[in-house]
Regions:
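A short beta-strand motif characteristic of beta-propeller blades
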Residues: 1, 34-41, 76-84, 130-136, ...
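Beta-rich, blade/repeat-based domains predominating
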Residues: 1-16, 42-61, 66, 84-109, ...
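Beta-propeller domains
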Residues: 15-40
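Short, solvent-exposed loop/turn segments at conserved positions within beta-propeller repeat blades
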Residues: 22-23, 62-63, 109-120, 158-161, ...
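A short loop-to-beta-strand structural motif that recurs across blades of beta-propeller domains
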Residues: 26-28, 66-68, 113, 120-123, ...
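Structural recognition of the beta-propeller blade-terminating site
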Residues: 30-31, 70-72, 126, 167, ...
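Short loop/turn segments immediately following beta-strands, especially the blade-tip
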Residues: 166-173
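Blade-level signature of beta-propeller repeat domains, shared across WD40, Kelch, NHL, RCC1
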Residues: 230-255
């Protein structure tokens, strides 16, 4: 698919690839035949989506600092308020576990405004809608995933050039922080998990998508002609790799 302004955060859901185009901004779904549909127009960018266990879509509207929920009638309602969690509120990436816990991360500074660097963190929004910070001190938190057993959360630290893992407690808290993979010169952005528990990560400055196992061993590399911001596995057997690739000109081009 071409003509995407700035594609981010792909997810395979109900036999289609869903992703956010931060340009308009909007959420789009496309099937394997290339037929696409604009699902909704987002209030602002960055915007990212995932689904609750009951199938309702969650959407982060970063500018407002809100986690929104799409109801069956198509309306968007507030699921959680992130404005009190950190400044700026998190809004870069979203992942939901099988219990309905939503994790939202973000850097500790406003990159789009050229603010001075500060490390970021991860917020938890419970199924009841309460929000709190559950991890901090991550240089630049980016892509996230939760393992199928709901036991581990893995986050890409772009500035730290590593994948960091946490154990997920029964109340959604994160503990036992550890480096899951040191990526050397790799700069991870969006990530996804495959059937062998290896992780694919998009790499913007190195223009590639890389598959690594725990510990950092590189298993496979797909070279591209532009920055790879995110990736997802989908298709009938969840083995087709989809990559969101964009010619990156800096954050000022997104304003």
């Amino acid at each position: 698919m071409t003509g995407i302004v700035f594609g981010e955060q792909p997810r395979w859901h109900e036999d289609r690839l869903w992703f956010s185009d931060w340009g308009p901004p909007e959420v789009i779904a496309v099937d394997l035949e290339g037929k696409s549909e604009v699902i909704l127009e987002a209030p602002s960018f960055p915007c990212c989506v995932d689904w609750l266990p009951d199938g309702r879509l969650l959407l982060v509207s970063a500018r407002e600092g809100l986690l929104l929920r799409r109801e069956p009638d198509g309306s968007l309602v507030t699921h959680g308020d992130l404005t009190g969690v950190s400044d700026p509120p998190p809004g870069n990436e979203l992942v939901v576990d099988g219990r309905g816990n939503a994790y939202v991360n973000g850097p500790g500074f406003d990159m789009m405004a050229g603010a001075e660097f500060a490390p970021g963190g991860i917020a938890l929004v419970t199924p009841e809608g309460s929000a709190r910070q559950v991890a901090d001190g991550i240089a630049f938190p980016n892509g996230m995933l939760v393992t199928p057993d709901n036991a581990t959360l893995i986050v890409a630290d772009s500035y730290g050039k590593c994948l960091t893992a946490f154990d997920i407690a029964s109340d959604g808290s994160l503990a036992n922080r550890r480096v899951w993979a040191d990526l050397g010169d790799g700069v991870p952005d969006g990530i996804c998990l495959d059937a062998e528990n290896a992780v694919w990560y998009g790499d913007v400055p190195n223009e590639r998508c890389v598959r690594v196992r725990e510990g950092g061993d590189v298993l496979q590399t797909v070279e591209l002609d532009r920055g790879c911001f995110a990736c997802a596995l989908g298709g009938p057997d969840r083995s087709t790799l989809f990559m969101m690739a964009t010619e990156w000109s800096g954050p000022e081009k997104m304003l």
